[in-house]
Each structure stands twice: as structure tokens, then as C-alpha cells.
A protein has these predicted regions:
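Cell-envelope/glycan interface and biosynthesis
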Residues: 1-139
Length: 139
């Protein structure tokens, strides 16, 4: 199986899952608890990504709203309070290579920034401190 369950919930691609569990254990030794925000914030199927996308975006224009283009159509985020979301099929979550980390601020964020690269993880976007992506570990 290419996807592996991680505790307390969620799934990641096998190599990402092993690196996540190693990183989680190292964080625990430093008094930091790492966990996904929810089971849908690790691997997401295309259908899950589509459902989440359609909940956050609409076709009707909204002045000044963040946009995404999907299937040749411009979509507008429904509220500026909502975090942006990749189009279905365009997310690292769809590959099991991303995790949204719960409570990723303060000491948890500081620990991640200082240590994540040792385990093959990185922050993809500064604007999303909770979102980390697995890029692999050195051979």
C-alpha cells in the first residue's frame, strides 16, 4: 500500500509517513506535540479536494477576492477569512505528501522551522504556517 495510516488520524505516502512519525517522536522528546489538524488535512482524495474546494469557492465574481482557475473557469473565494485551497488534483495533499499541522504557531511553529528539514519536510508557503510538504530525505 502506498498510503500509510498515521496516528492519531490521517494517511500519508509511505516515505512521508515514516518521516512524519520520526519527526513527531523527536518533537515529543522536546516537549512539542505534532498532530494533523484533522484526518482530511493529510492525504485527500480528488473527491475530498473537490468537495472542500466547492465549499470555499464560487463562480460568481467577488470584487477583490482571491481567485483560482479550475477547468478553464475562474473561481472566487467566498470569504477572505477562509484559507486558500488548491484546485482538485493540484494539491500535495492529493499525493499524500502534505500535512496541515494543528496549532502551528508559537513553540510548535518554532520547533518545525528549526527541525522539519532534518526529516524531509518544508514549509511551502510562509502565509500558511500550518502547511508542510514532504520533499524527501537524503539517501
Amino acid at each position: 500500500e502506498m498510503l500509510v495510516d498515521i496516528k492519531p488520524y490521517g494517511k500519508l505516502y509511505v516515505e512521508a509517513a515514516a518521516a512524519w512519525m520520526d519527526m513527531k517522536q523527536a518533537a515529543k522528546q522536546d516537549g512539542v506535540v505534532l498532530k494533523p489538524t484533522s484526518s482530511g488535512d493529510t492525504y485527500r482524495s480528488y473527491e475530498m479536494q473537490e468537495r472542500a474546494f466547492l465549499q470555499r469557492y464560487q463562480k460568481e465574481p467577488i470584487a477583490g477576492a482571491s481567485t483560482r482557475t479550475w477547468n478553464g473557469v475562474k473561481w472566487y473565494i467566498k470569504s477572505p477569512k477562509l484559507a486558500p485551497l488548491a484546485v482538485p488534483g493540484g494539491s500535495w495533499h492529493n499525493l499524500g505528501l502534505a500535512c496541515d499541522v494543528a496549532n502551528a504557531s508559537g513553540p510548535i511553529l518554532a520547533w518545525l522551522v528549526a527541525n522539519e528539514d532534518k526529516f524531509g519536510w518544508t514549509h511551502e508557503l510562509d502565509s500558511e504556517p500550518w502547511h508542510i510538504v514532504f520533499f524527501g530525505t537524503k539517501a
